[in-house]
From Swiss-Prot:
Organism: Pseudomonas putida (strain GB-1)
GO biological process: L-histidine biosynthetic process
Designated name of the protein: Phosphoribosyl-ATP pyrophosphatase
Primary localisation category: cytoplasm
Gene: hisE
SUPFAM superfamilies in the cross-refs: all-alpha NTP pyrophosphatases
HAMAP family per record: HisE (MF_01020)
Keywords: Amino-acid biosynthesis, ATP-binding, Cytoplasm, Histidine biosynthesis, Hydrolase, Nucleotide-binding
Recorded GO CC terms: cytoplasm
Amino acid sequence: MSDTLNRLAEVLEERKHAAPDSSYVASLYHKGLNKILEKLGEESVETIIAAKDAEHSKDYSDVIYETADLWFHSLVMLSALGQHPQAVLDELERRFGLSGHDEKAARQPSA
């Protein structure tokens, strides 16, 4: 896993045990999963809007910024659920060489 993701995962774990007023992330953890999911939803919408704007303007700085926020809040959510970013990377690695159609079909129950 990248050094950046490892460092971020470590910081997120540390923030779980910090006072809510000590950092933004600590305050999110203190407010609970629903607040974290609310933020994740907001960041998802902001990323979509930035992507639509970038399509026309060809200025990608906002979509990069918003995607970073989206990834960050996704990592906060995973951490709140006791999951490490490596689990997502492992899942992405598992999907290499697997057709998206085949993967989707494997998830659907047979009739």
